[in-house]
Curated annotation (Swiss-Prot):
The modification Pyruvic acid (Ser) is found at residue 113. This is S-adenosylmethionine decarboxylase proenzyme. GO terms for cellular component: cytosol. InterPro entries: AdoMetDC_fam_prok (IPR003826), S-AdoMet_deCO2ase_bac (IPR009165), S-AdoMet_deCO2ase_core (IPR016067). NCBIfam families: SAM_DCase_Eco. It catalyses: S-adenosyl-L-methionine + H(+) = S-adenosyl 3-(methylsulfanyl)propylamine + CO2. It comes from Methylococcus capsulatus (strain ATCC 33009 / NCIMB 11132 / Bath).
Amino acid sequence: MDNKLQLHGFNNLTKSLSFNIYDICYAKSEAGQRRYIEYIDEAYSAKRLTQILTDVNAIIGAEILNIARQDYEPQGASVTMLISEGHEAPAAITNSESPGPMPEAVVAHLNKSHITVHTYPESHPHAGISTFRADIDVSTCGRISPLKALNYLIHSFESDIVIMDYRVRGFTRDISGQKHYIDHDITSIQNYISDATADRYQMIDVNVYQEKIFHTKMILKDFNLDNYLFETDKDQLVPEERAHVQKQLQREMAEIFYGRNYKLRR
């Protein structure tokens, strides 16, 4: 698509990214589960989430107009930012179908759209499994696509599973009056993810091109049991327990990834 498209007035296209991440954990006791929930709730407090969203604003070249944030009892947090497109997008960020920056490359600079994040820690009542979900929605009106924030978001959370939906709505007119229903090329959300990140995940696409709807699921390829154990390691588990816990964790991840429940085989 022509990057030099001359528009009549403001770019009225709305580009929306829905980004859901999951972190999975196993704790041997109910007390351990409670401590995990307390740990993850503190790690992703409203204050921390505000900083993450501030960096997202810098990536997409937005100006923050208002921030509302709240920590909830017994757990969970929410942050909502009202934003507008900045006078200038960051020089290194374009609307091309390519990955955006990593967290270490972002310097926050605060120069009618919005960004929201909500967190949902929870635990299985009997199996020792706990999950943490963060839902992030980035909706922009203007030139820059929120997809440029993907790399940063994936690396800002402990992402075992990532589910993403991107859509473009509305239209904008060029100077001749012709309507344009999208202003950038896109074949897959995967093209906005760096090779280093893509190598770590199995990914599935479901896209409806004519409706400007793009859907990508990601799940980590390599399973290291120690990465999913809280306050213990696999050497502290007897072989039978180790195998059972690994099966539980992998089943939980598969159910979340595919959105369906499976019977646990004995």
